[in-house]
């Protein structure tokens, strides 16, 4: 799965479920938690409204 496919998968997962932790996304997408964090940061910087709360996850 390339970066674009992974970022799209993150968006789709966040739309399906209200809140997801980075660890859950990493397991689902078979990648590292750090990669998920970088992808979420890139999505946020490009204007995608992703809310992250430490200890609670992303929505």
Per-region residue spans from a language model:
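Short, basic/aromatic recognition patches that contact phosphate-bearing ligands
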Residues: 1-59
